[in-house]
Structure formats: structure tokens, C-alpha cells
């Protein structure tokens, strides 16, 4: 059943606009949304995500990829798209980055009673959702990921730079949490350097 229109224009919201650098756990429902919109006469959709930042963390690029496929085929398989994205976007670093992504998803799922599902909510940044030990542990994942792609540094510098950039983008989120939520765990000089490094990477990535 439809709404009697075959030319429905839709503007959807896809991230937490109060917590812009945090992952928003809607990856798995994007395709379902497209199916729903199509059923009710959707003809055009503008999925508003991180449009202000070129390279936002929280797997925004995965969301963009799923959207790009779902707009042309609402019956695309979510798991296949995720597998393909990680395979080609991270290459040899895919296993460790997929593990990190899965852990983020699980963590958000078990804490939905705290975060809620609204795009305008401060609950997503609640310290109970992101314990310091968990966030700190994730930083090692990016070091491992960078080591996995080192072989391209001398054989294919262009590919190496692209893959290294992809990993760096995702490292922004846990670094941001440590810089803003757990600054008291570091000395004044340490947190100053951490924030300086974060800001440089954030801006160098075109954000």
C-alpha cells in the first residue's frame, strides 16, 4: 500500500547531530529504510549525514557506501555490502578494522537504554557507554591496522597513503573521547599534545 503518490521526496537524518564525531548505530537499518520509502512512493531521497566534514569518523564512509548501493537497489544484501566495503577499503587491515567496527556496534546495542535512538541527544557521549579502558584498548587496533598495510609503502605508495588515511579517519573517534572525556587521566603536557595531534589530523583530513 502507498500514500497515493509516486513522487515522494524524502529528507532523512543519519547521525547524532549533537555528538557529531561519535558512531551512530544505524548502519543495519539503512537498506530497510530505502525499502520502506520505495513502498510508499519515494522517488528522491537526501540522506543527510556528515555533510560538513569530508572525512568524519564513526564509519561514515561505510554509511555512504551502503546508501549509494541502496539508492539503486533496495534489495541489496547488508552483510555482503559490509564485507565488500571492509575488503577493499582497508585491504589487509580489514580483519582488525572489522573487529573494531563489530565491537562498536555491540557496545552501542547493549547500551541503547542510555543512548536512545534520537539524532538530537547527548546520551551517545555518556561515559557509561564508552569506558576508558575500552576506548584506550581500541587505539592499539589502529597501530595493528597500520602495520598490516606497511608492505604497500614501498611497492604502491598511492595505495598505502589511501589505506593509511582510511585507518586514520577511524582513529579520530576514540582519540576524541580520550581528549574530551578522560583528560584527567593524563598530565597537562600529555593532554595538550594529544589534543594538538588530534586537531592537526582532523584538519589535515579536510574536516
Could you say what each language-model-derived stretch is?
Residues 40-42, 67-207:
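Catalytic domains of carbohydrate-active enzymes that cleave complex glycans
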